[in-house]
A protein has these predicted regions:
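Short helices/loops that flank or line small-molecule/ion binding pockets
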Residues: 1, 95-110, 122-127
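Ligand-binding "clamshell"
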Residues: 9-26, 119-139, 145-160
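A bilobed periplasmic-binding-protein/Venus flytrap-type ligand-binding module shared by bacterial periplasmic
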Residues: 32-45, 142-148, 165, 173-188
């Protein structure tokens, strides 16, 4: 199971992947990996993703070092032209420690790409409320991000998705993709796929993120 950008990088041999993995095959899109770029509201006057340009030396978490969150976060910020390399004081933490750090005032924001709702975001919002902002995306920034790899699409948080969230939030998500190798027997791939989709209701009882899974969009946003 790969994040969509890693599927694209694996096929082309770009980003953190050293050479093309042309033996890889996409089986289908699973649930969405939803971008939660979070920033203290005092630094987010517009509430939009480009407010990240207001960071000037403060600590910000893109994820754990060498994690998928860090790699996709760097790609997104590079593509948007946000100068995080010189303006952010990057910290590297997992989701749990990141939540504690923002609650304690040790960081000003965090990048949490995950299936929504995310428990770490829920905890942070429960304590900080309107002092915290999940940044919105615009059509312009979405188009810019999708220029090379058209993987991302809109993902909406209606009010109440997170504690103390009173306004609609429009962010983006890319699919987590189930992949296999070209040499795996077709029947084995079929049986695995069949088991997943025939037991979707059970998966949805285990984790709310799987409620995004639908057959009609299972081939959208595949990177390979």
């Amino acid at each position: 199971l790969l994040q969509g950008p890693f599927g694209a990088w694996s096929w082309t041999g770009e980003g953190p992947v050293s050479k093309p993995q042309t033996h890889m095959r996409s089986v289908g899109a699973m649930w969405q990996n939803v971008e939660h770029f979070v920033l203290l509201s005092r630094l987010a006057p517009t509430g939009e993703i480009m407010d990240l340009n207001n960071i000037d030396g403060e600590r910000y978490v893109l994820g754990q070092r060498n994690s998928g969150a860090e790699q996709t976060g760097r790609f997104i910020l590079d593509t948007l032209g946000i100068d995080y390399q010189s303006k952010f004081n990057l910290a590297y933490m997992g989701y749990g420690p990141t939540t504690s750090a923002i609650q304690d005032g040790n960081i000003v924001g965090m990048n949490v790409p995950a299936g929504a709702p995310v428990s770490s975001i829920t905890q942070a919002y429960a304590l900080l409320g309107d002092r915290l902002t999940i940044l919105n995306w615009t059509q312009e920034t979405l188009d810019l991000l999708n220029a090379k790899y058209p993987l991302w699409d809109w993902y909406d948080f209606p009010p109440g998705t997170y504690p103390n969230q009173t306004k609609h939030i429009r962010t983006i998500g890319s699919p987590n993709v189930l992949v296999t190798r070209a040499d795996i027997p077709e029947d084995a791939v079929y049986q695995i796929t069949k088991v997943i989709w025939e037991n979707l209701a059970t998966l949805q009882e285990i984790h709310g993120a799987t409620k995004d899974m639908r057959l009609d969009i299972a081939i959208e946003g595949l990177g390979a």
